[in-house]
Amino acid sequence: MFRIFPVLFLLFASLTSVAAKAEVVATFYSHDFGDHFPHAFVKLKGKVDSTGEQVDTNYGFTAVSVSPAILMGSVKGMIETKGDKYIADSNPHFSLRLSDAEYAKLMAMVDKWKNLPGKSYSLNSRNCVHFAMEAAALLGLSVNRKSKFFKKPK
């Protein structure tokens, strides 16, 4: 009779819900030509475990003004966020679950790119694909820094 109590306890314990661990998920996207300039960006969504901060944003790096000047050389660059429709019309490629430390490192990288001085955007050496690649490398992924596809985010 008393042997059934441990079995019932284990059964009950296995059926009760366990609080989900808070985490931020980084999803890497690309956006095709069409009505918009092609683009690569990272969407962050979730909850920072240590602070409880809810995160739902995205970051990409682009020229302040998309004009023929980007074909001639470096121009002013900026970090930008896109709206829900733009994201819905984009292509998610992969996602990574971030620890609080990884999230903090990624946000520091975003801040660094946001504060790059002068003409920081270059179609050939510092564009949205480079930004996404550096974010992926920062999070521990292997990247090909010699790729010929830096002008083609998809």
Regions found by a protein language model. Name each.
Residues 1-8:
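Bacterial N-terminal signal peptides that target proteins for export
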Residues 10, 46, 136-137:
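Residue-level marker of positions within ordered structural domains that often coincide
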Residues 12-19:
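C-terminal segment of classical bacterial N-terminal signal peptides
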Residues 22-92:
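Glycine-rich catalytic cores of cysteine/serine-nucleophile enzymes that process amide/ester linkages
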Residues 22-24, 55, 107-154:
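Activation targets extended, charge/polar-rich intrinsically disordered C-terminal tails
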Residues 34-37, 96-106, 121-129:
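Solvent-exposed, acidic/flexible segments
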